[in-house]
């Protein structure tokens, strides 16, 4: 069984890598954003608790997020293992996750960090733009529409760039994220779970390196 956390700054390629890992290893992809939406829609006890904070514009406390993660990891669909997306973000959350995986007897097997130079990340993120009509995401470096100037999904010709994808904003976002990411890497390094992979490579080569690490668990 593979129970995995994928770490990396925005633009490091976690989304693409996650899809490939899920396809090959049949892991359950667990996103905290999706969990919150699902729990609130289903009006579960933890979902309602989280909603009470969100409705007031407050951050959801770590303990509530951890309860939600534990609820999700307890579900029967996690047979082959899981890949966690968006949790933990801090060492406090990592400690809480430790407790959860021990209680559920589903220990983490791997923590993989995708390392990409800041300049590359800024280039990647500030190349992103979106369809004004349907929100489809494109990238000037890696994912242009099939027909230039026409959205693949809805056929619209209007595009825009989000404020937080502009270079100066991207730089600030990366600095904030790195402050959170570095202690997490140290935390898992000390536990002997961390593997660092060069995220500057092609998506195919990145997955090849991840695959080499994960195949040792089978």
From Swiss-Prot:
Where Zn(2+) binds, per the record, is at: 131, 134, 151, 154
Q: Which Gene3D superfamilies match?
A: P-loop containing nucleotide triphosphate hydrolases (3.40.50.300)
Record: residues binding AMP: 32, 37, 58-60, 86-89, 93, 162, 173
Q: Which residues form a coiled coil?
A: none
BP GO annotations: AMP salvage
Keywords recorded for this protein, A-Z: ATP-binding, Cytoplasm, Kinase, Metal-binding, Nucleotide biosynthesis, Nucleotide-binding, Transferase, Zinc
Task: Please give the InterPro entries that the UniProt record associates with this protein.
Answer: Adenyl_kin_sub, Adenylat/UMP-CMP_kin, Adenylat_kinase_CS, Adenylate_kinase_lid-dom, P-loop_NTPase
Region span, LID: 127-165
Alphabetical list of Pfam families matching this protein: ADK, ADK_lid
Q: Which reaction does it catalyse?
A: AMP + ATP = 2 ADP
The protein's Enzyme Commission number: 2.7.4.3
Q: What enzyme category does the UniProt record give?
A: transferase
Q: Which residues bind ATP?
A: 11-16, 128, 137-138, 201
Pathway membership: Purine metabolism; AMP biosynthesis via salvage pathway; AMP from ADP: step 1/1
Asked if the keyword Chaperone belongs to this entry, the reply reads no
Give the molecular function GO annotations: adenylate kinase activity; ATP binding; zinc ion binding
Q: What is the annotated localization of this protein? A: Cytoplasm
Question: Where does the record place the region NMP?
Answer: 31-60
- Offer a single GO CC term for the protein: cytoplasm
Query: What this chain does, per the record?
Result: Catalyzes the reversible transfer of the terminal phosphate group between ATP and AMP. Plays an important role in cellular energy homeostasis and in adenine nucleotide metabolism.
- Domains as described in the record: Consists of three domains, a large central CORE domain and two small peripheral domains, NMPbind and LID, which undergo movements during catalysis. The LID domain closes over the site of phosphoryl transfer upon ATP binding. Assembling and dissambling the active center during each catalytic cycle provides an effective means to prevent ATP hydrolysis. Some bacteria have evolved a zinc-coordinating structure that stabilizes the LID domain.
Membership in a protein family: Belongs to the adenylate kinase family.
Quaternary context: Monomer.
Q: What is this protein called?
A: Adenylate kinase
């Amino acid at each position: 069984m593979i129970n995995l956390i994928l770490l990396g700054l925005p633009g490091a390629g976690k989304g693409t890598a996650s899809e490939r890992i899920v396809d090959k290893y049949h892991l359950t992809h667990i996103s905290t954003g999706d969990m919150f939406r699902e729990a609130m829609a289903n009006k579960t006890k933890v979902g309602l608790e989280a909603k009470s904070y969100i409705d007031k514009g407050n951050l959801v406390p770590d303990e509530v997020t951890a309860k939600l993660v534990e609820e999700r990891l307890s579900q029967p669909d996690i047979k082959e293992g899981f890949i966690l997306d968006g949790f933990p973000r801090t060492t406090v959350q990592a400690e809480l996750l430790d407790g959860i995986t021990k209680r559920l007897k589903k220990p983490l097997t791997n923590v993989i960090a995708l390392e990409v130079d800041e300049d590359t990340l800024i280039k990647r993120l500030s190349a992103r733009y979106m369809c004004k009509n349907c929100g489809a995401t494109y990238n000037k470096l890696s994912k242009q529409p099939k027909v230039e100037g026409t959205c693949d999904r809805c056929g619209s010709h209007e595009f825009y760039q989000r404020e937080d994808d502009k270079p100066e904003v991207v730089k600030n976002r990366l600095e904030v994220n790195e402050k959170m990411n570095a202690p997490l890497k140290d935390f898992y390094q000390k536990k002997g779970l961390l593997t660092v992979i060069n995220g500057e490579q092609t998506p195919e080569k990145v997955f090849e390196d991840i695959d080499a690490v994960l195949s040792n668990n089978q």
